[in-house]
Swiss-Prot record:
Annotated family: Belongs to the BsuBI/PstI type II restriction endonuclease family.
Quaternary assembly: Homodimer.
Species in which this protein is naturally found: Bacillus subtilis
Protein name: Type II restriction enzyme BsuBI
Catalytic activity: Endonucleolytic cleavage of DNA to give specific double-stranded fragments with terminal 5'-phosphates
């Protein structure tokens, strides 16, 4: 329904459709996001499109000031999850092009229209549009075709103690632990230090006991360690990660066990459950404790947050 919309908004919806965006992004909100990415106000034409760096809140302000469309402050997540995420995956917008290493979900996050997309859209409503659109689409897959592709993230390997090696034995559980160390940690704990990795052929596959002691934690022989423990020096966080292939996730009972086991930690505790895929995660969804994070190995560049005010961080 486009009745009552400004012509720029109506045309932006048509552009999104022609670019191959799914129906969920062929709407007024997404059209206004596209207009804000190019700073196209009511008095401007497509040929006047620009490429400013712009965050979610400024986008919402743009909608209100220039098109009289006011969104509630709690709509920010809707903008992010149901429009801008798809724009980035489609390659029509860039995420933090000024600083790619900016942390996930930083309040300083910004977006920018992608250069080729900008040049194409400048030609909308001209005789060249159809030909240029066909050429543009032939050089890139549309979002519908590549929706499940992960976005690239800058990755910094986790550090292990000098002179130590980790041996991963074959098996689904060990493979997931390997993915946590090689895929999860570089994305979400860049520059982190591995303290413990269990179930790698030995009961104590890898254990930097001295570093853990320096953080105020001494584990007795009866304490059931999580599968992976990583220290994040930059944030002074200690991540306790359970890898789930057959046994359960960090549920309420396990949350309490780990809290007691790591009670002396001088670093803030972050609880994470890792699954190999979303179908296995779905089986355990009702058991996952609140105030934890969930990571799925087959979608490594995404993190699922269970409640609370922080996206990733310890709870006091």
């Amino acid at each position: 329904m486009t009745e009552g919309m400004h012509s720029n908004v109506k045309e932006a919806i048509k552009i999104l459709k022609e670019l191959g965006l799914p129906k969920g992004q062929q709407n007024e909100r997404s059209a206004l996001c596209l207009l804000s990415l190019m700073n196209i106000t009511q008095d401007k034409t497509w040929s006047e499109a620009e490429s400013p760096l712009i965050g979610i809140t400024p986008m919402m302000e743009f909608c209100r000031i220039n098109y009289g469309k006011e969104y509630a402050p709690n709509s920010r997540e809707t903008f992010r999850r149901f429009t801008m995420h798809q724009f980035v995956d489609a390659g029509i917008a860039l995420y933090n092009p000024d600083k790619p290493t900016r942390p996930v979900n930083s309040p300083k996050a910004v977006y920018q229209i992608e250069a080729e997309t900008l040049e194409l859209i400048k030609c909308y409503n001209t005789e060249e549009w159809s030909e240029l659109l066909a050429r543009y689409l032939s050089n890139r897959q549309t979002l519908v075709e590549r929706y499940a592709k992960e976005r690239q993230q800058n990755k910094i390997p986790v550090q292990i103690a000098e002179g130590k090696e980790i041996y991963i034995t074959p098996g689904e559980h060990s493979e997931l632990i390997k993915a946590i160390i090689e895929e999860f940690a570089p994305r979400y704990v860049p520059g982190g230090r591995l303290i413990y990795a269990g179930d790698t052929g030995e009961k104590m596959g890898y254990f930097d006991e001295e570093l853990l002691r320096q953080l105020g934690v001494v584990i007795d022989s009866h304490g059931k360690m999580p599968d992976v423990v990583i220290y994040f020096p930059e944030k002074k966080w200690l991540l306790l990660i359970e890898s789930v292939t057959s046994h359960g996730p960090v549920d309420h009972k396990r949350h309490e066990e780990l809290a007691k086991l790591f009670n002396g930690s001088t670093a803030g505790i972050v609880y994470v459950t890792a699954f190999p895929n979303r179908s296995l995660m779905a089986r355990y969804l009702n058991n996952i404790s609140w105030e934890t994070e969930v990571w799925v190995a087959d979608a490594p560049s995404h993190l699922i947050h269970f409640n609370g005010v922080r996206f990733l961080g310890p709870y006091e």
